[in-house]
Amino acid sequence: MKKLILLLILFIVSACSSTSELEQIEASSSLMPKGETYYDLIGLPAPQGSMVAAVYDFRDQTGQYKPIPSSNFSTAVPQSGTAFLAQALNDSSWFTPVEREGLQNLLTERKIVRAGLKGDAASLTQLNSAQILMEGGIVAYDTNIRTGGAGARYLGIGASSQFRVDSITVNLRAVDIRTGRLLSSVTTTKSVLSKELTAGVFKFIDAQELLESEVGYTSNEPVSLCVAQAIESAVVHMIADGIWKRAWNLADTQVGLQNEVLKKYWLEAHSVDRVQARLNQG
């Protein structure tokens, strides 16, 4: 019995120490964390020249809402796909995005500037036209594609764990402004992981004394971060696909084809033999 009581005391102390971590959480703002896809994006080989790209709308096409029992009209995925795509294009050295989502606001400001210039309106330079139009959107959000867990309880002492995996699917297309031809189209997915760990004690120490304690931990990947990573992955795959099809050129072909990031993404889309043959072609 003494060993059991000692075990319970140790369990309660560990639970209290875990709970004390909540006191260290502070509400603060910071830059969005960067994932592996971001470093792949900036690690691609240099292009022969940056292409001007326009993004009018990159929206949520799933039409899904959060599965909450109470009345709630919050969408399951963020509605900020256009902003994430523009950021990813800007972070890459391959594209120069131009503002199109807020085009009306931009035109209004230009009218104000032109009115102030009076007779010297010609000094206001014209807007840059795009070479490539980026289309697509968030095309699917699948919930509970994998679920599971494990647990055990003995004499009122036990622990359990659960996990759930959702999936976000993004489609990105590059269209030639001059001809309307589809230069590249890629579809990427990103898993959204949620997990929960719990442990508890419910045991009578003697006839009139009951010990009850529980501790738990839940972790949910931010959906907004997963959307951003799926879009970054789509941009990297699109650049790699364009190089594969020779739709756009590398600054240095010999050096660029040896880039590890480029070869990694080629191997995701093609077999080893095809990639080796493409590398031999130069």
Task: Give a label for each model feature.
Residues M1-L4:
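Positively charged n-region of N-terminal signal peptides that target proteins for export
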Residues L6-L8:
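Sec-dependent N-terminal signal peptides
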Residues I12-A15:
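C-terminal motif of bacterial Sec signal peptides marking the signal peptidase cleavage site
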Residues S17-G49, Q162-G282:
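C-terminal/domain-edge helix-coil "capping" segments
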Residues G49-V52, Y56-N144, S167-S184, R274, ...:
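N-terminal segment of the mature soluble domain
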Residues A121-A122, G156-S160:
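Extracellular loop and loop/strand-boundary signature of outer-membrane beta-barrel proteins
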Residues T147-A152, T198-V201:
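Outer-membrane beta-barrel translocator domains and adjoining extracellular loop/strand segments
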Residues A152-G158, E209:
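Flexible, solvent-exposed loop segments that connect beta-strands
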